[in-house]
Each structure stands twice: as C-alpha cells, then as structure tokens.
Curated annotation (Swiss-Prot):
Homohexamer. The oligomerization is ATP-dependent. Residues 3-151 form the Clp R domain. This is Chaperone protein ClpB. One of its GO terms (biological process) is protein refolding. Keywords: ATP-binding, Chaperone, Coiled coil, Cytoplasm, Nucleotide-binding, Repeat, Stress response. GO terms for molecular function: ATP binding; ATP hydrolysis activity. InterPro entries: AAA+_ATPase, ATPase_AAA_core, Chaperonin_ClpB, Clp_ATPase_C, Clp_N_dom_sf, Clp_R_dom, ClpA/B, ClpA/B_CS1. Residues 774-866 are annotated as: C-terminal. Its main location: cytoplasm. Residues 346-552 are annotated as: Linker. It is found in: Cytoplasm. GO terms for cellular component: cytoplasm. CDD domains: AAA, RecA-like_ClpB_Hsp104-like.
Amino acid sequence: MNADKMTLRVQQSLNDAYEIAVKYNNQQLDIIHLFSALVNQKDGLIPNIFEKMGVNIDSLKRDIHVQIDRMPKVLGEAAQSSGVTATRRINEVLIKAEEISKQFEDSYISVEHVMLAMIDIDKNGAVGEILRKNNITKDGFLKVLNEVRGSQRVDSQDPEGTYEALDKYGTNLIELVKQHKLDPVIGRDEEIRRAVRILSRKTKNNPILIGEPGVGKTAIVEGLAERIVRGDVPEGLKDKVIISLDMGALIAGAKYRGEFEERLKAVLKEVQSSEGKILLFIDEIHTIVGAGKTDGAMDAGNLIKPMLARGELHCIGATTFDEYRQYIEKDKALERRFQPVIVEEPTVEETVSILRGLKERFEIHHGIRIHDSAIVAAAKLSHRYIQDRYLPDKAIDLIDEAGAMIRSEIDSLPTELDIIRRKILMLETEKEALSKENDDASKERLVALEKELAELQDKNDEMTIKYEKEKSHISAVRDLKAELDEARGLAEKYEREYDLNKVAELKYGKIPELERKIKEQEASMEKDNENALLKEEVTENEISEIISKWTGIPVTKLVESEREKLLRLEEELRERVIGQDEATTAVANAVIRARAGLKDERKPIGSFIFLGPTGVGKTELAKTLARNLFDSEDNIVRIDMSEYMEKHAVSRLIGPPPGYVGYEEGGQLTEAVRRNPYSVILFDEIEKAHDDVFNLFLQILDDGRLTDNKGKTVDFKNTIIIMTSNIGSGYLLENKSGEGIEDDIRENVMNEMKLRFKPEFLNRVDDIIMFRPLSSEGIKKIIDIFLRDVENRLRERNITLEVTDRAKEILAEEGYDPVYGARPLKRYISNVLETEIAKKIIAGEIYDGSVALIDGVDGKIIVSRK
C-alpha cells in the first residue's frame, strides 16, 4: 500500500497502532489496534463523529482496552527478538478503504474511509462487538459524516483541517449573545447604523471599522450581534450569523505549503455556501495582508478579494488608523472593496454612560459594589492623566483594576485581625518558654501573660466571627447578583422563543424576588458598615489610588501627613535655599495650587525663570523641590542647555527625524517626561542654548504638551519647569537693598532679558524671579548647611564634629566671594576642612568614637581631637 495515497492522519494512526501493539506485548498488529489509534487521536475526526452520535468516548476506550488485553501476549527474550507483524486483516482494511475513497471520489485515503472499511470487514470480530455494544451503526456513522464533511472532497493530505472550518477557526458571536456572555454595548448607535447601511448594499457590502486602539471597534460588532438577536435590524439582516474569524488559529500549525490556503478556502467556501447568511468578522483585518505568504504562495488578502468584489463574502473588518494606512491603503484593490466607518473616541460623558452600562457585570464578577462617583472619577481622571491611551478602554481598565484590588483585600485577612493573630502566636511562644522557668518573676510574668493571652483570644474569636459573617454577606450578595444576571438572560431567551409563561415566571416571580433579597442583604451590610472589617465598595479614592500607581501623579485625596508636608513646603525650601524668599514662595504656591486642584489644566504646574549671579541657589532650589515632592532627586529631569548651542541639537530633545541614527530611541526630554509625567524639569543656563530651542518651549509652556519625532504627544501638564540663567547678574550684584531688588536694577535686568529672548517666549513664563547676592547672614546659614553634610558623612564613621564660631568666621571670610556666590565656599570646605580631617583620620589621630574639633587660630583652620 502506497503511503503517499494516505492522509497524514491515517499514516499517524498506523504508527500509533504499531506502538499500541508493542505496549500490550502483542506480536500481531490487528484491526483492534488501528481502531484504538483512531479513537485516541487528539482532535481527530472519528472521536468527533462518535461524540456527535452520542457515544460515551471514555466507555468506548475502556471496551477497546479490554479487547486488546485479551489478545495473545509474548513476553521475555522471544518478544524482543521477534518484531510486530501486521495481520492479513489490516491489509484487507486498507485495500477496502482505498475502494471506499474512490466511491467518495476522494484523492486520498482518509480516516473515515478506514473506519468504514473496519465496520464492513470486522463485523463479527472484536471491533464489531465493541460497535454493537456502543450502538454504533454504519448508517448512523455515514449520516453524521455527511453533516461534518458536507460537500468537501479529500483533495489533500490533511482534509480534517477543512471540515467544520468555521467551528474550528471562528467564534459565533450570535451564540455568545444568546448565552449572555458578551458585555452590553452602550451608545455607538451612529456607527452601528452606518455599518448596517453598508451591509445592506448589493456590492462592496463590507464595512471596515477604523479607530484608535481601545475606542470600541470590536464592541460595535458585538452591539450589531445584540441587535440581530433582538431583531432590531432591517429585514435583510435578520437571522444573520456573525462569525469572528481567529487568524491566529487559521495560521497555527499550517506546516506545509498550501495548508493555510486550504483552510482559508474551506472557511470561505462555508461562508459562500451559506448564501449571505454568515457575516465574517475579522478583527485586526490588516493581518490578512501578507498572512500565509511564502515563496510563490498567495496571501489571505488576495484569496478573499474576488469574493469581496462579487458580494459573495459579507466581511466586517476592524483595524487602527496606523495599520490601515500601512497595510490596507497600500493595496488599492483591497482598499476599494471595503467601506470605512470611522470610530471616534467617545467623550467623557459618553464614557460615563458606557461604564454605567458595564457596572453590573463588574460588580458580579468581582463580588463588590461600585459607586457612581467611582465611575465618574474613572472617566474624568483617565481622560486627564492617562494621555497615551483612549477612552473608554482606559476608564474600563481603571474600574476593573479597582474592583480586583477590593476583591483581593476581601479575600485576604483584615490587617487588624492579622495583627492580633501574630501577637497571639508571639505570646504563646513566650508562654511556652516561661512555663519551663521556676523563679517567682517568671511565674508572675506567666500569670500576666496568660491573662493578656485570654483577652486577645476573646478578641480574636469575636473578630473572626465578625469577619466570617461579613465575608459570607459579601459572597451571598455576589451569588444573588450572578443568579439575577442569569435570570435576566433567561428571560431574554424565552422572550425570543415566545415562551410567555416562563417569561412571566421570571419577570414577575424570580427576578423581583432576587432583587428584594439583594436589597435586604445590602441593607443589613449597611447597618454594620460603620465598624466593618472588610471594605466592599469601589469609591473615588480607589480610582485615584490606581491612577497614582499607574502614572506617579498624586491624584489621591490629601491625607493629614501630606497636608502638613505641603503647608510646610515653603519653610522646607527656605531651610536649604538661603536668602531667596521670593523664589521659594512662588514655587511653593504653584505646587499648593496644583495639589488642591485649582491650577489651569492645560498648562504645566508652574514655569519659572530664575535669574541671578552664579552660586546663589538657583539650581539648588530645583533639587530641593524635587527632594521634598518625591523624597529623592531622581525625579528631576536636568538638561544642561550648554549642550544645545547648535541649531541641530534641538532634535536631541524630541528625537531625530526618521532615517537618522537614534530615531528609535526618541528624545532626551520627551522620553524622560513620558516615563515620569510628574517631575521637576530643570533647564540649566538657558542663555547658552541656540535660539531655535526656545521655539519648542512655546507649546510646552502654553499647552503643556510637546509632539516627539514619532508624532506622539507628550504631556507636560504635571511638570514644574524651572529655567536658570545668569543674564543680568552684573546688575544684580550691584543691588544694595537688603530686603528685595531695587526697581532700576529689576528694569535693567528685564531689558537685557528682552534683548536675548523673544517676547512670545517671555510672555508664556509664569514668573521671572531674580535672586539676590548672598548677604553675610545668609553665608553663615549656608556654612551650617555645608558643615551638616560633612557631619553626616563623619557620623557614618562614628566621629562627632564640633565647630567653633571663630572657625565659621574664617570659613565665611576665606570662602565667600560675592561674584561667585556659595560655590567657592563649598570648594574651600572641601579643599581645606575635609582634607585636614582626612589627614588626621589616616594618621590615626581621629578615630571611631572620637570628637573632631574645628577651630580658628591666626586666620587658619585647625583640626584636632577633642
């Protein structure tokens, strides 16, 4: 028998039959082994047909095992030396199968031919006995085979892949709607109406839904399926079936050339033979362009074009704008066969309606309650803070994650109860240890401990009962809601079937009863809600918390500790940045306005230009602000503008254009802000940058956004922008006023600024703040700050630092220069003071646990051990 004439499944079953014979120590390969191999084939046609005939497959497999077990076995050396030989009956079956394949007008011997041959040849044998026992007849087998195969012919070595192709590679959306498994679709009426109009055309009746990811393209098709089930569609679309095609399943496992095309042709043939009853929905339709394309083979797009043009294939596609442009528009012949339906992102108000429609499904799934305030917050906050995704998807994700968070808290032990149980465990361990001691103190402690343990045990029992009761209440409500949802689904089903008795039973009996029970359960929970251990509601706070986790932007309501921190922000800034009260006040006020929710939503939190001589605290203020807001300086995006002196350096901020090296990496500024949307951005020494760089700043300062080299919008609305400059520092050094900046000096500085920067740039900045030169009082405070840093480093070595007033005076005289600010002071402390201390430590004069005394003698700094 020529193996090339057999399908792959028949060849596989013969190999499996041989292995079964070896496993059971049979010397002969007989029909029963081949029958066993066919029945045990994974996703095989024979077990599929038997299941459709109502045969219990497990029972059938047991009967086969019993029959094979009865066959003669050869054990020991004789079994190893002699191989397994095929019986004459096996060859008879294969010859008969070949004859049957010719009767069926098939090109290959397939598994159904082999099965029919076995039924004929082994009527009185082991296989015949099993078939009779399980009520499997030839006529019954042929009847189901015709249903499965239809008019298909075996023209390839893998024909099973083409039988019931739509069931294998598609999902029936109409059935899912009937089974109440799809989420309700709210709104989108205009898009659904447009899709219905296109589907009702004579030719080119193929809508393609185009929209951004997450705007609800697939939901529109599900909404259409819902309408078809309800009968809320034109006459031409009633009783249509929507099948969602799974391109992944269609391609997966197609090893040989032509196998993919064969499967797709089988799908298209089924759609065609339905005579317009089936609407084929291909999600991510751009995948058909190039799908299955190998050397010389046609891709899926070219295979469906002729049917689309003739109107034989009703197809609904869905894809994004980018993919439509990249794949579909390039293929003009494919593009003209589809009619685009643009799906816009819904507004915040529409999103709220969509979420209200989905609310009940999420409540049932998570077993919790969702407040309406949470729904409104999810729509508003996601729209405001999550810029790179689209409504309603991002808002739905927020609700889902908040529900999951509350659910996981319900399923885990409440914190109060957990603390008590851990304490009981600790005290029991201590009790065990004390019970072995005999002294009076231990006995007294044991009595006190037993009393404390008894109290805790009572408290634990009381709280455990309360916890179990609350949990059972929540579970009961969840089960009742699931039951109510199921009852509503059944009511819809019976309404479609016009079974009015059952509809009345459900609508006026079961459903009101379940609603009453849910209300009762929720009322009893409300009563105990004040001191409840478990929280079972999603509120605005949970949504804010998740937004904060996703973006790093503080959206949550202010807790007491944070209120204090914000109110003390100005004070904290002044502790590090000495003598610049105007600057610290302006920055602190901007942050407070933003955190209270009163800032302009379209602009950054604040944008400032700090002017002043070098070393007066301009950059230090930005660092201190970052440290206070984020507890670290990591959230400061520092860009030294001296690196942007050339015109072409602008591309480094937003990323180079396509075709240039580094295009994929993006820009230094845009990528940093995309990763950390809530940060302080410091543009240091802005006067050093090229004029063209400031053109970028205009849209950042005005609209709080910037478009990078890939066309993506980066959101700057939650950043604080600080620019520093030394422009006008010559005038500022002449300032003699101790309190503020003199008017004529301020005017001179502003005139110089206007000469250097364009008016449209200066006009968009919130505040231009001038820093005064440091006073002698300020220098003393700065010395204390610098010495505190040295002290902290020495503390790590367990060395204490003491500095006399004379030493501080010398540091102020030697280290301070009005032109250079505090930087020379820092250098002086580093070069003189730290060096002297280091020498003493190396020499062993100052060691761990000692006190280093810093004194001033004859205008010099002296370091000694106290």
